[in-house]
Amino acid sequence: MTALSNMKCEACQADAPKVTDEELAELIRMIPDWGVQVRDGVMQLERVYKFKNFKLAMAFTNKLADLAEEEFHHPGIFTEWGKVTVTWWSHSIKGLHKNDFIMAAKTDQLLV
């Protein structure tokens, strides 16, 4: 399978299918530092990135904002001193789509 970070997001409409349990099991193995959270009944991907200070955390946040705009898919971002919590899910389907896994992998690439 092509690396997730090399894929592009596809337009996701409200009737797009959520990932199946089988797809979830396969895709989550490709982004091992991410966890699955359920908030208000909505499955989401989440990872906490740690940094040495606020300035580095903010620089990462800004790079992530640029990436989100390029792909037109936007995460939840919580930036604080020394860490950034990133949450991906597809708002239109209230759950996880392959796009979320692609963006999680691309987010990890921002550290390289």
Curated annotation (Swiss-Prot):
Which GO biological process categories is it annotated with? tetrahydrobiopterin biosynthetic process
What HAMAP family does this protein's entry cite?
Pterin_4_alpha
**Would you tell me the protein name for this molecule?**
Putative pterin-4-alpha-carbinolamine dehydratase
Entry's EC annotation: 4.2.1.96
Q: Record's CDD domains? A: PCD_DCoH_subfamily_a
Nucleotide-binding among keywords: no
**GO MF entries:** 4-alpha-hydroxytetrahydrobiopterin dehydratase activity
Report if keyword Heme is assigned: no
Read off the lineage from the record: Bacteria, Pseudomonadati, Pseudomonadota, Gammaproteobacteria, Alteromonadales
Recorded catalytic activity of this chain's protein:
(4aS,6R)-4a-hydroxy-L-erythro-5,6,7,8-tetrahydrobiopterin = (6R)-L-erythro-6,7-dihydrobiopterin + H2O
Question: Which keywords does the record carry?
Answer: Lyase
For this chain, the family text in UniProt reads:
Belongs to the pterin-4-alpha-carbinolamine dehydratase family.
One Pfam family this chain carries? Pterin_4a
State the organism named in the record.
Shewanella baltica (strain OS185)
